[in-house]
């Protein structure tokens, strides 16, 4: 891991712990412990497996993009690089995952300007897919339609704008006239060439379908959490409702641009569950369980992947120069 990111990751971990503590106080700590006792922990490994399936499908999207851009790499190293970036899951909008580009550069000299657009394309298709997962539930649940529609329109419009080659090349030509940017124009052209190839209709549709499937696995994990608790609450939550609540909460957490959506996602999950009349302690327990099984599990997977990558490649990632911004 990188020294300059260690403090950020540690800060996010502390912030996450404090948020869990605050929610524990909100739910009444003793009642929260009772809720955890009600949960059948034999289902927890299954929820982790579903989260990992999310990672596998997202990796397939990464591989699909990598092949479109003709970036040569063995599947094994590509998988380790992909998972290593999960340590950056607690950076705003997950954009710290551009770490993948720096590792690719170390492996085969691929310019960051060529591969970094993959991260942008990943985020675009993630947003579009989550909107797709949420949209039906929003109208059934009668909540959040406006936010979801706005986010959907914004990201679809952004994708269409990126695919408007003439306009984008004209914009880049304007950058050439700005003195301190003119020296980077070649990189801008390289980056645009990559992102343009990734957002064409066929790659966009394929990547979005992969994203829908991958994020549905985590929605399914949340559904299992709620149904394990149903014996204690006597409230059956449909898969459609669970998908909406998890997807919507993930969406606004990402929009907030806070590290890992910390605080915002948890508040949304808990609040929406309480709208369903699920007791406060069960709502908070469900939120903590799914966040540990998704966000924090991803960070742990990323840490192990970084360790394995360093040992296999004999590279010290501390020595890789990366920008200070996540």
Located regions from the model:
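Predominantly cytoplasmic-facing regulatory/coupling regions of multi-pass membrane proteins
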Residues: 1-82, 140, 144-253, 295-326
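Transmembrane alpha-helix interface/packing and boundary motifs in multi-pass membrane proteins
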Residues: 84-93, 245-266
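Re-entrant/interfacial helical elements at transmembrane boundaries that shape
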Residues: 95-107, 256-275
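Short intracellular "coupling" helices and adjacent cytoplasmic loop segments at the cytosolic face
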Residues: 83-98, 103-106, 195
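Hydrophobic alpha-helical transmembrane segments in multi-pass integral membrane proteins
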Residues: 190-191, 257-260, 270-289
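Membrane-embedded alpha-helical segments of transport systems
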Residues: 87-92, 114-138, 252, 289-300
């Amino acid at each position: 891991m990188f020294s300059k990111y260690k403090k950020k990751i540690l800060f996010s971990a502390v912030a996450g712990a404090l948020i869990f503590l605050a929610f524990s106080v909100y739910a009444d700590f003793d009642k929260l412990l009772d809720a955890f006792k009600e949960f059948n922990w034999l289902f927890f490994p299954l929820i982790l497996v579903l989260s990992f399936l999310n990672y596998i499908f997202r990796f397939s999207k990464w591989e699909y993009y990598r092949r479109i851009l003709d970036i040569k790499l063995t599947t094994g190293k590509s998988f380790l690089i992909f998972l290593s970036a999960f340590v950056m899951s607690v950076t705003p909008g997950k954009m710290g995952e551009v770490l993948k580009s720096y590792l690719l550069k170390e492996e085969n000299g691929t310019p960051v300007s060529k591969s970094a657009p993959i991260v942008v394309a990943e985020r675009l298709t993630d947003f579009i897919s989550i909107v797709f997962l949420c949209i039906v539930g929003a109208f059934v649940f009668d909540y959040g339609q406006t936010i979801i529609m706005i986010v959907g329109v914004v990201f679809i419009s952004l994708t269409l704008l990126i695919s408007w080659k003439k306009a984008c090349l004209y914009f880049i030509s304007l950058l050439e006239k700005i003195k301190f940017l003119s020296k980077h124009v070649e990189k801008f052209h390289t980056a645009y060439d990559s992102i343009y190839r990734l957002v064409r209709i066929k790659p966009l549709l394929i990547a979005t379908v992969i994203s829908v499937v991958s994020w549905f696995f985590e929605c399914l994990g949340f559904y299992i959490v709620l149904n394990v608790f149903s014996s204690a609450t006597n409230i059956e939550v449909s898969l459609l409702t669970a998908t909406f609540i998890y997807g919507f909460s993930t969406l606004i957490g990402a929009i907030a641009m806070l590290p890992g959506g910390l605080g915002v996602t948890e508040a949304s999950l808990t609040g929406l569950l309480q709208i369903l009349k699920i007791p406060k302690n069960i709502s908070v327990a469900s939120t903590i369980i799914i966040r540990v099984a998704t966000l924090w599990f991803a960070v742990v997977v990323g840490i192990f992947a970084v360790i394995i990558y360093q040992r296999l490649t004999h590279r010290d990632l501390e020595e890789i120069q990366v920008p200070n911004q996540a």
